[in-house]
Swiss-Prot record:
InterPro entries registered for this protein in UniProt: NSF_attach (IPR000744), TPR-like_helical_dom_sf (IPR011990)
Signal peptide: none
Role summary: Required for vesicular transport between the endoplasmic reticulum and the Golgi apparatus.
Coiled coil: none
Entry's family note: Belongs to the SNAP family.
Domain of life: Eukaryota
Entry's Gene Ontology cellular component terms: SNARE complex
Originating organism: Solanum tuberosum (Potato)
Chief subcellular location: membrane
Entry's Gene Ontology BP terms: intracellular protein transport; SNARE complex disassembly
Single GO MF descriptor: syntaxin binding
Location(s), subcellular: Membrane
Protein name as it appears in the record: Alpha-soluble NSF attachment protein
Keywords: ER-Golgi transport, Membrane, Protein transport, Transport
Length: 288
């Protein structure tokens, strides 16, 4: 590991000397870029992530001197992937630089890819407002028109919103995805999942009347929904909430989970509902 660091520092020093010297046209930047790239690879082998990130930023600057925004963007992305392991703030900063350069050269797919990475980093840091912001950018990078965003991006925004206890926003998005999908042969099989997600968010609000009204709407939207395990789960959970019965709530979740494992997001939200239900049950016990 020490050898890799020593080699990396040697390449980096040689690159700095190239930049400080005189050369025709852009050759010194080309030579320095090659050396910085080698230095970055050495630092990565040594798992010296801060050094690797810093040297890739220097590499990006060389590419900018050579008027190559594409290569500069790639170098910033490489820097970010190193910083991800040691410095989230720097990782986000480098990804933002990469996005800006990809937008400049019209590489919208690459911009969207790195917006997604930024959103995931903010989610990791529990900064859900920022995660939502960058997930929105991912929908249609470089444009104000978000009229037909991909369902996966919208789903992520809805999930972040629910995690942040912004349930009405999450419900609105999940229901819109379901409406958009129900008449699409490729997407219609996912409708029950979106309606389940919307229903769980309804449960988090804790008011039984809107939950039951929502279930009626969902069955009108998709007539097949009433015969699904997802619908049965929501009906059983709504009944448990109405009866303030924690055991009934737990049994309904266990029954569903035994056949279709609940993911972490759904589990987190259902635990919130259960804790609220427990608190109500204890309150009732105290009163009696």
């Amino acid at each position: 590991m020490g050898d890799h660091i020593a080699r990396g520092e040697d390449f980096e020093n040689k690159a700095e000397k190239k930049l400080g010297g005189w050369a025709l046209f852009g050759s010194k930047y080309e030579d320095a870029a090659d050396l910085f790239d080698k230095a970055g690879n050495c630092f990565k082998l040594a798992k010296s992530w801060d050094k690797a990130g810093a040297v890739y930023v220097k590499l990006a600057n060389c590419h900018l001197k050579l008027d190559s925004k594409h290569e500069a963007a790639n170098a910033y992305a490489d820097a970010a992937h190193c910083y991800k392991k040691s410095n989230i703030k720097e990782a986000v900063s480098c990804l933002e630089q990469a996005v800006n350069f990809f937008l400049d050269i019209g590489r919208l797919n690459m911009s969207a890819r790195y917006y997604k990475e930024i959103a995931e980093l903010y989610e990791q840091e529990q900064n859900l407002d920022q995660a939502i912001r960058y997930a929105v950018y991912e929908i249609n990078p470089g444009s104000e028109d978000v009229s037909a965003p991909p369902n996966q991006c919208l789903k992520k925004i809805a999930q972040f919103s629910a995690q942040n206890e912004k349930y009405p926003k999450a419900i609105e998005i999940f229901e819109e995805i379901a409406r958009h999908s129900v008449n699409n042969n490729l997407l219609k099989y996912g409708v029950r999942e979106h309606l389940l997600n919307a229903g769980i968010c309804q449960l988090c609000k804790g008011d039984v009347v809107p939950i039951n009204n929502a279930l009626e709407r969902y069955q009108e939207l998709d007539p097949t929904f009433s015969g699904t395990r997802e619908c049965k789960l929501l009906v059983d959970l709504a009944a448990a909430i109405d009866e303030e019965d924690v055991a009934k709530f737990t049994d309904a979740v266990k029954e569903y989970d035994s056949m279709t494992q609940l993911d972490a997001w759904r589990t987190t939200l259902l635990l919130r509902v259960k804790e609220t239900l427990k608190a109500k049950e204890l309150e009732e016990d105290d009163l009696t």
